[in-house]
Amino acid sequence: LFSAHYYGLGYYMHGLQSQPAALTPAQEKCEKFMTLVAENFKTQREIGFYADKLCVTGKYLSTMLKQETGMTALDWIERHVVLYAKSCLSSTSMTIQEISDELDFPSQSVFGKYFKRVEGMSPKAYRQSLSKD
């Protein structure tokens, strides 16, 4: 499941690599952003962190990503965080608290609310849904 996490990134990157011309500045920024997210999503969920690293504003970063990929910066960050959490929930015996700690959330409650907002169900409900399949 966690490999699905990179499907969107891989699909986008394949599109960039198959283009004969050099990358546009926006495409280069997208590539750098995705690399930064893959390296930092466990501890950095703020758009400002990534925008600062890329020397752009958060608004510009999100607009550029939306134009290039169809997803905003926050969408990409949340996708990485939640897909990693789903992978842990489905393929490890880690507790929800341990996953919350691994992803640097201030509490299990905050993690649960984040997961539910993005995924539409709590981490516990997600794990239980896996055992029904």
Task: Outline where the language-model segments fall.
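Short, Lys/Arg-enriched, Trp-marked, Pro/Gly-tolerant hinge/linker segments that flank
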Residues: G10-T35, E39-K53, Q67-D75, R79
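Residues within helix-turn-helix
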Residues: G48, K59, T95-E98, Q108-S109, ...
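Residues within the alpha-helical elements of helix-turn-helix
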Residues: K53, E102-L103, V118
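Short hydrophobic/aromatic patch on the recognition helix
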Residues: L61-S62, V110-F111, F115
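Terminal helix-turn-helix DNA-binding modules in bacterial transcription factors
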Residues: Q67-Q108, Q128-D133
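…primarily DNA-binding HTH/wHTH and HhH modules…
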Residues: K113-D133
